């Protein structure tokens, strides 16, 4: 569906509701605001295929800006507002953005960027500052009607950089004239939304940062379907539960670290909320420990739907709760793309053997890494298969199990160790809030297993807790997979989507 169609069909129906401020944008307003943004972009000379960058917190004008770029045929790059100015500068320049849109909330970063972003037109929401125009004032006088050359744009999002510098994932823009004719919608997204039952009656809760691929794509999908998006300004366990009850949420999307935090909420508080409207809880972004998912299904019921995909969107697997209970630990079977498990020589491996996970097949999406031909080539095999860098295996029914990322593998005394199993065990210990496991140098063995733990109570960090956790590991998994030593940190460096910046921890031990 198209924002113009929805805007005419139900102009007064809420499209976006901010859970904290309770600000509302209706479908009619979403259509008009995005048209005004599109006219602004054209007035500044932007043509289909040009790029803009958006660095915003979870702001109520986020989606009017996204749809303005989309219906202008532009590439839009959403950037984490938690990045350092130098990191934002790199992405804005690399994506070749002609416009940067940010907010007063990020004024200090914006001021730093103003010094280094020559030739980029800069706008600010909720005010202005040196070098930035007010976006609201710039669009206020623009027409609310459709631009003459309306056509479909798309995102160029950057990988989170958990193993190196972020790279833009670039696909050919559709530039399909709008509004859509029947059958012209993105077939991959349409299929996913159909499976989840997205429609005009859907009320979708979005608790994660909107700049990330999953919240961005699911929100735009549910809005295009005529639904309502409930946006949490930031994730809070009780606010999320309260929002499900208050707005009668039907669909939601999470990451495993949110589940871990949910499960640490006192049971007496959990049971205060009516979650009966909740039909579909989607999760991805990082592997979910089996014990965590078991407890979430026990609590919420068999409404959890997991998928495995990346910003590259070169393939996707899906699994519902019933399938998962029969294949615990799996991330599903391919929805599109075909799965291949390959050894280091690119040869197919049999069922049950661990190797690199690759997507291929005619229905897999083709992509390239913007301005990085070498990285694009390294992600592809001679057969044309592409990988997200994960390691795993297939069972006899074709279900995929992820073992870990290839770059995280520890080689100790010639034995390959994947730290995910150790992490999944440690995170379930009642005194552990978060954990990272990786290899550190060992003169005799090459590498040894190291854990860095974020304790629930920082005052307990020390030799006694270290000994307790190491003993706990050795009681439940083999000693070779158990950490030789454990260090403690107040907080681990996680991306807001739940991905762990393990290299930031690991690099300290390899210098």
Regions found by a protein language model. Give the residues of each.
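Conserved AMP-binding/adenylation subdomain of ANL enzymes
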Residues: 177-207, 211-251, 265
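Conserved AMP-binding/adenylate-forming
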Residues: 20-23, 39-86, 416
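ANL superfamily AMP-binding
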Residues: 13, 28-53, 83-85, 89, ...
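AMP-binding/adenylate-forming catalytic core of the ANL superfamily
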Residues: 62, 83, 100, 242, ...
């Amino acid at each position: 569906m198209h924002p113009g169609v929805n805007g005419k069909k139900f102009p007064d129906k809420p499209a976006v509701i901010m859970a904290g401020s309770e600000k509302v944008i209706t479908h009619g307003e979403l259509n008009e605001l995005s048209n005004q943004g599109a006219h602004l972009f054209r007035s500044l000379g932007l043509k289909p295929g040009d790029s803009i960058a958006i660095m915003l917190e979870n702001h109520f004008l986020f989606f009017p800006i996204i749809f303005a770029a989309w219906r202008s045929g532009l590439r839009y790059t959403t950037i984490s507002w938690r990045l350092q100015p130098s990191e934002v500068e790199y992405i804005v320049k690399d994506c070749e953005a002609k416009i940067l849109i940010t907010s007063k909330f990020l004024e200090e970063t914006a001021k730093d960027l103003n010094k280094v972003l020559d030739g980029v037109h800069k706008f600010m929401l909720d005010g202005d500052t040196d070098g930035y125009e007010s976006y609201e004032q710039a669009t206020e006088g623009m027409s609310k009607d459709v631009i003459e050359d309306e056509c479909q744009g798309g995102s160029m999002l950057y990988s989170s950089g958990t193993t190196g510098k972020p790279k833009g994932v670039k696909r050919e823009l559709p530039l399909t004239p709008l509004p859509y004719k029947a059958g012209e919608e993105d077939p991959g997204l349409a299929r996913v939304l159909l499976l989840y039952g997205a429609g005009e009656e859907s009320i979708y809760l979005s608790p994660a940062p909107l700049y990330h691929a999953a919240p961005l794509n699911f929100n735009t999908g549910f809005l295009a379907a005529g639904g309502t998006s409930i946006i949490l300004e930031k994730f809070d366990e009780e606010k999320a539960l309260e929002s499900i009850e208050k707005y009668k949420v039907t669909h939601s999307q999470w990451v495993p670290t949110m589940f871990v935090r949910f499960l640490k909420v006192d049971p007496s508080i959990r049971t205060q909320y009516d979650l009966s409207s909740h039909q579909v809880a989607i999760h991805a972004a990082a592997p979910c420990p089996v014990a965590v998912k078991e407890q979430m299904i026990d609590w919420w019921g068999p409404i959890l739907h997991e998928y495995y995909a990346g910003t590259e969107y070169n393939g996707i697997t899906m699994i519902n709760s019933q399938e998962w209970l029969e294949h615990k630990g799996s991330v599903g079977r391919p929805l599109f793309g075909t799965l291949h498990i390959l050894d280091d020589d690119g040869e197919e491996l049999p069922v049950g053997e661990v190797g690199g996970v690759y997507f291929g097949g005619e229905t897999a999406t083709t992509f390239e890494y913007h301005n990085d031909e070498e990285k694009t080539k390294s992600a592809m095999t001679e057969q044309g298969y592409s990988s997200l860098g994960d390691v795993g295996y297939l069972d006899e029914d074709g279900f995929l199990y992820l073992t870990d990322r290839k770059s995280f593998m520890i080689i100790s005394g010639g034995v390959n160790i994947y730290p995910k199993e150790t992490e999944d065990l440690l995170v379930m210990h009642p005194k552990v809030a978060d954990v990272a496991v990786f290899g550190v140098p060992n003169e005799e063995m090459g590498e040894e297993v190291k854990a860095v733990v974020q304790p629930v109570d920082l005052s307990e960090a020390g030799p006694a807790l270290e000994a307790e956790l190491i003993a706990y590991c050795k009681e439940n998994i083999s000693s070779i997979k158990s950490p030789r030593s454990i260090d403690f940190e107040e907080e681990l460096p996680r991306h807001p989507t739940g991905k762990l910046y393990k290299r930031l921890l690991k690099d300290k031990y390899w210098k």
